[in-house]
Amino acid sequence: MSVLLVGVSHRSAPVSVLEKVAITDADRPKLIDKMLASSHISEAMIVSTCNRVEVYAVVDAFHGGLAEVGELLTRHSGLAMPDLTKHAYVRYSEAAAEHLFAVASGLDSMVVGEQQVLSQIRGAYATADAQQAVGRTLHELAQHALRVGKRVHSETGIDRAGASVVSVALDRAAQVLGDLAGRTAVVVGAGAMGGLSVAHLARAGIGRIIVVNRTIERARRLAETAASYGVESSALELDRLHEAMSAADVVLSCTGAVGAVVTLADTHRALADRDRAEFPAGDRPLVFCDLGLPRDVEPAVAGLPGVAVIDIESLQRDPAAGAAADDTAAARSIVAEELAKYLAGQRMAEVTPTVAALRQRAAEVVEAELLRLDSRLPGLAEPERDEVARTVRRVVDKLLHAPTVRVKQLASTPGGDSYAEALRELFELKPGAAQAVAAPMEITAIGPDRTAGLADDFTPGHRLDFEQHLGEEGKPA
């Protein structure tokens, strides 16, 4: 069994494609159930954020698993297979682990070094685990990835470029508005991103925060959090969004809803109210930070006078969205080190059952020979028989000690699983003595680039996409 990753992210696809592939919290359990019901998938986890959707699946065959995940994503997104393959990337086995470690470290984020992705991976794991979709393989992979992310953030300065997408969005808003201190902000959505927005706004010295949400109770709770930071705050239901916007300087939205939340009609109403107020719209810009995926702000809003829209796609071009080169290099070094540890542990886990099976086989042979001795020498005294038994067992243990210790050492090296395979072949151990591994033919389909450098993860030389493996109908090529 090996881990297959199929993903679409801000690096590989435009926002229009990401919006279609986006998986909501409500959809995620349904898609996991469908994967578990398929023929080749035994474990599954979906990481879905504002700028990425990644499916991690433990599969018994590369091509079969890829076909099933690809079909699932095309049905969910409504995209034709050729359209999906243009923007999807595939990682397998070691490369899948390397990618998740990089994601957890913030190396693959739109804002390099942001930490929110750690909680998103933790949430993805919790959702999959609650559905009993996580076994040993994904458990160890996800937990190790979380440890890698924590280590990178504690030992490097990779997050100095900005704690999250929110911080960069607010920097862009400040370029339009000037200092944010004392201004009024509207936060649309009371989820994790809403909470992050409130924290960043408070640190920026915002004067007032209005939280808008479909559920007023959640809006009030987040408003109370804002108040605990010493910021004047209030809460409104979503149908009163235009009222909040009429008083705002900046609106941050990330609801995860399907369809526009900030509509052209509501924005027109808000701007009309501002025109009747003390400050005309032309003298008081209204800035929208649309952090939602799918987008929360209707595209036509960006064309209104006095309005600026900062969205996920524009943030990709922000020069402030990168960490210092030395911090990034240090983070990559940690990822490489931890990947080597993880892979060594996985190889060891694969060889341990084989060693145990070998010792069990030897013990069975010893017992069989002792029984044969009893039948041949029925008059053998008990003390002599015990001494013979101890001697035979010592001989067997000494013969097995060196090869079993050595095979465990070799198992931690690249290609070490071949030694365990040799033991299984030489001693005719049962196939179930160790986990099955992917056939060599399937592994070589990945090519020599399975451990490609993280910096060029999506360049043509390093990217592996569906088209190498699937036909137009999503069947194995």
UniProtKB/Swiss-Prot annotation:
GO terms for molecular function: glutamyl-tRNA reductase activity; NADP binding. It comes from the Bacteria. Homodimer. Possesses an unusual extended V-shaped dimeric structure with each monomer consisting of three distinct domains arranged along a curved 'spinal' alpha-helix. The N-terminal catalytic domain specifically recognizes the glutamate moiety of the substrate. The second domain is the NADPH-binding domain, and the third C-terminal domain is responsible for dimerization. The gene is hemA. It catalyses: (S)-4-amino-5-oxopentanoate + tRNA(Glu) + NADP(+) = L-glutamyl-tRNA(Glu) + NADPH + H(+). Catalyzes the NADPH-dependent reduction of glutamyl-tRNA(Glu) to glutamate 1-semialdehyde (GSA). Belongs to the glutamyl-tRNA reductase family. During catalysis, the active site Cys acts as a nucleophile attacking the alpha-carbonyl group of tRNA-bound glutamate with the formation of a thioester intermediate between enzyme and glutamate, and the concomitant release of tRNA(Glu). The thioester intermediate is finally reduced by direct hydride transfer from NADPH, to form the product GSA. It holds the Pfam family Shikimate_DH. SUPFAM superfamilies: Glutamyl tRNA-reductase catalytic, N-terminal domain, Glutamyl tRNA-reductase dimerization domain, NAD(P)-binding Rossmann-fold domains. This is Glutamyl-tRNA reductase. Pathway: Porphyrin-containing compound metabolism; protoporphyrin-IX biosynthesis; 5-aminolevulinate from L-glutamyl-tRNA(Glu): step 1/2. NADP(+) binds at residues 189-194. Its EC number is 1.2.1.70.
